[in-house]
Amino acid sequence: MAIKAAYNRRQTISYHVVLAVVLCLLLARPLHAWEVTGYVGMEDLAFIERPLDSRQHMNYVSGVIEAELYHEWDNGSQVFAFVPYFRGAQYDSNRTHFDIRELTWVKAAESWELRLGIREVFWGVTEAVHLVNIINQRDMVENMDGEDKLGQPMINFAFIQDWGTVDLFILPGFREIPFTGVDGRPRPRPPIDVNDAVYDKNGFARQVAYAIRWSHSIGDWDIGLSNFYGTSRDPVILVETDLTGQMLRLIPYYQ
């Protein structure tokens, strides 16, 4: 319990540091020409078959609010973007969540870009499952396909040349995958116990990751090479059983 509480405090501190730095950079500039967009939606997740667990339900109603605050200045060479996201869900408390998808400041020059804050990074490729999108954690309570991502605090420097773009990343603050709770559907049986996640790394090594990527376009071909060092965003699911082999719970193991 003490380890979990310490982890939560470190994660909160990393978000507060990112927020303070971005706001200081923003307030140093005149505030004009702001763009505000967003959407509000309702969803009814319904199932044909009755659940196996009496704690689950046949349908789940939820509401979504997402906004985007966008501002650019200095002839477009500096950009601020803020994208908060909230879903309020019926029955499943794990699916009710708030996330900052983006809170970022960008400074662009002819041969480089500096991006500081909370961001979503997409390394686009052609496969249906984007296996190389390893910067951001998956938001599994939003969609089981893993396409929705959680915002990730980062420092990202891009070196832009004719022979390609090199992106360097420092990623403070590891985020666990949120999974559907015991009342939610769909979910495995037994449900995944996120409160007792196991880690291969501890301390600073667990919290901070690094990545580098080179990308280039040649005609119709997009080429990319990347390397990631840190705690994997994709956990191995461990099975805990009793003496008879009956499954008791599933536990995420982050390597």
What are these regions (language model features)?
Residues 16-28:
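Bacterial N-terminal signal peptides
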Residues 33-49, 80-82:
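Transmembrane beta-strand segments of Gram-negative outer membrane beta-barrel proteins
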